[in-house]
């Protein structure tokens, strides 16, 4: 196991911080939906978008929540994660989604924008929101809270213990 960061810079996010930033995202989205300011549903991009989506749904009192599972990274076996072509593993309910109008699609981070680019082609009228955004991916997101440099690696609390630990079942 390497002791080096996967990228030049690391930004550690605590549970408290992701909660505060996700609430800030909800406040920014409040009263901006197409139905008199309301949104009809929240769709989380799994897995990273699940915690922010839960918080946004709670804050905006949105009861219809679904997920879309997109894979665009491959764990590099102790090396930095490697990008690969994005593909949908599980889509949200088709009747709910239509072209995406009135739906908030939430993720934790837009990095290269490849995941959001794929999902946007499927649901062009959805509103895409992330908590954090890197410059390369910013054009793919409609609303975000905090910008971070492209060379910053974000360590989310669901990936961390006192030090990084691999998931019990391994990778991918």
Curated annotation (Swiss-Prot):
Guanine binds at residues 111, 154. Its cofactor is Mg(2+). The keyword Glycosyltransferase applies. It is a peripheral membrane protein. One of its GO terms (molecular function) is magnesium ion binding. GO terms for cellular component: plasma membrane. Mg(2+) binds at residue 108. Keywords: Cell inner membrane, Cell membrane, Glycosyltransferase, Magnesium, Membrane, Metal-binding, Purine salvage, Transferase. Pfam families: Pribosyltran. Xanthine binds at residues 111, 154. It is found in: Cell inner membrane. 5-phospho-alpha-D-ribose 1-diphosphate binds at residues 47-48, 84, 107-115. Its EC number is 2.4.2.-, 2.4.2.22. One of its GO terms (biological process) is purine ribonucleoside salvage. Pathway: Purine metabolism; GMP biosynthesis via salvage pathway; GMP from guanine: step 1/1; Purine metabolism; XMP biosynthesis via salvage pathway; XMP from xanthine: step 1/1. Belongs to the purine/pyrimidine phosphoribosyltransferase family. XGPT subfamily. Purine salvage pathway enzyme that catalyzes the transfer of the ribosyl-5-phosphate group from 5-phospho-alpha-D-ribose 1-diphosphate (PRPP) to the N9 position of the 6-oxopurines guanine and xanthine to form the corresponding ribonucleotides GMP (guanosine 5'-monophosphate) and XMP (xanthosine 5'-monophosphate), with the release of PPi. To a lesser extent, also acts on hypoxanthine. This is Xanthine-guanine phosphoribosyltransferase. It comes from Jannaschia sp. (strain CCS1).
